[in-house]
Design a protein with these regions (language model features):
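Secretory/organelle targeting and membrane-embedding segments
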Residues: 2-64, 68-383
Length: 383
């Protein structure tokens, strides 16, 4: 391992070229180059240009952290520049949520188990909730976060990608190309967000953070209702929520079923809920109705949980898994230019004149109460 200091600019590459030359001498040839741009997004363009100007683009791969653009226009400008330096096959736009083993379980459990897959549609499901609350504050990320906010940092990236994992049609195969195509086809069916169905919030002590203006309007919370215009999902709301300084930390996908029909319909039987816990090694929970103990045939709610720790041996951390995929050329968990463009089209209404006002919420609460209305009468499964 070598360290190349001194910065990296078009005008001055620092010591990077010397370090690469040393590696070439040791290896007896040019090493494979992987440029991992885990840098502020404002530095993407100039760093990409520097890679080109110093002759480091040909035959290499480039990994870009989120956010890859901050709007449709800035995404298009950045992508045009990137494609002037790299071919699309060289570019990997990383989203570590897709690298989580538990996230990848969404499509595998669905397609491999008829028990779940046959019920995965509007015929059986009333609502899908994707919930990623955090108890943490913004810590030492004041400058980045105040320029970005929760919606841009999390909604158009992680939550949209998880929604696509849930909603995609069965791919032609489990190859990288077919998985990526299936996920991005459903992103193109995301209806542009309706600002009237979006709630933005800011935790009360946010403006007391060093580096944050007293009048900051940055959102630290977002909840949104997303509609997907495909035959499978038409009429089923996907309700997405994430935020800082909330009452609990979790990463969950909850598939809420329609009420059962038949002789128990009027007895108060609870809805079935299938929950994918994406945290850590992951788990699957099923809420179901069972008989309440006693002489009468009364319903009671029970939950069964399948922890996946017993099959987690050998699991790699998300970034390790994704960087391995980059090195081996597996693009199944990365977003193409077209897929990200579709995500920004769906997100665009939140960046216009109708963007909702930011509502203040108490630290360690569940966020603005107005977000409860997005779930209709079902309420948040995580509360």
């Amino acid at each position: 391992m070598r360290f190349a200091g001194g910065g990296f600019l078009k005008s001055d590459p620092g010591s990077l070229l010397d370090v690469i030359a040393e590696a070439e001498a040791d290896l007896g040839g040019r090493p494979a180059l992987l440029h991992y741009l885990a840098i502020p997004p404002t530095a993407f363009a100039r760093t990409t240009e520097a890679i080109k100007d110093h002759g480091l683009a040909e035959g290499s791969k480039a990994v870009y952290e989120k956010p890859y653009g901050t709007s449709t226009a800035s995404f298009q400008d950045l992508d045009e520049l990137v494609h002037s330096v790299f071919d699309e096959e060289q570019v990997y736009r990383i989203d570590h949520f897709l690298g989580k083993e538990a996230t990848q379980n969404l499509h595998l459990v669905r397609f491999a188990n008829r028990l779940f897959g046959d019920a995965w549609s509007a015929e059986h499901l009333a609502q899908v909730q994707i919930d990623v609350p955090e108890t943490l504050d913004i810590d030492d990320r004041a400058e980045f976060y105040d320029e970005t906010g929760a919606a841009l940092d999390m909604l158009v990236t992680h939550l949209f990608q998880v929604a696509a994992e849930v909603a995609m049609e069965p791919p032609l195969s489990m190859s990288a190309e077919d998985l990526q195509a299936a996920r991005e086809a459903v992103i193109s069916a995301f209806r542009p967000l309706d600002p009237a169905e979006v709630v933005l919030g800011q935790y009360r002590t946010y403006r007391q953070t060093e580096g944050i203006a007293d009048d900051s309007k940055t959102d630290t919370y977002v909840a949104a209702r997303l509609w997907i215009d495909t035959d499978r999902w038409r009429g089923v709301p996907f309700v997405l929520r994430t935020g800082k300084k909330l009452a609990a930390s979790a990463q969950r996908v909850s598939l809420i079923f329609r009420p059962a029909e038949g002789p128990l319909h009027s007895t108060g039987a609870h809805r079935n809920v299938l929950v994918f816990d994406l945290h850590g090694n992951g788990a699957i929970e099923i809420d179901m109705t069972v008989k309440q103990p006693g002489p009468e045939p009364l319903p009671a709610e029970g939950t069964t949980r399948l922890n996946l720790e017993n099959i987690a041996e050998g699991a790699m951390p998300p970034y390790t898994s994704l960087l391995y995929d980059v090195l081996t050329g597996n693009r199944s968990l990365f977003t193409s230019s077209a897929g990200l463009a579709a995500a920004f089209r769906a997100f665009a209404p939140l960046q216009g004149d109708q963007r909702p006002e930011v509502q203040i919420y108490e630290d360690d609460s569940w966020g603005p109460e107005a977000a409860d209305a997005l779930t209709d009468q079902l309420g948040w499964h995580l509360h």
